[in-house]
């Protein structure tokens, strides 16, 4: 599914004009990007959590040559699906599940 597909779904299901649907989708994604760029977590109930984690500098190996190389410190985006989403994907009953803040066990400096 692409961003254009999401806009089309919003247009068809909510009845906004295509321009309004596009602006809404852009606003949502811009907000998510800004929050994540600021290092904050995004928790979407029934869907999952997006978390920016810090990765420390480390030594790795070039798989072709075996040569050791330095891998710079960086930030990575991780996604952890909610229990509800996992159950839905596996065709399991999910009405009894509650969303939990499962992201508290992330190690920010792996």
Swiss-Prot record:
One GO location term (cellular component): cytosol
Coiled coil: none
Key words of the record: DNA recombination, DNA-binding, Transcription, Transcription regulation, Translation regulation
Transmembrane segment boundaries: none
Example of a GO biological process term: positive regulation of metabolic process
InterPro entries per UniProt: Hist_DNA-bd, Histone-like_DNA-bd_CS, IHF-like_DNA-bd_dom_sf, IHF_alpha
Recorded superkingdom: Bacteria
Family: Belongs to the bacterial histone-like protein family.
Function: This protein is one of the two subunits of integration host factor, a specific DNA-binding protein that functions in genetic recombination as well as in transcriptional and translational control.
Protein name per its UniProtKB record: Integration host factor subunit alpha
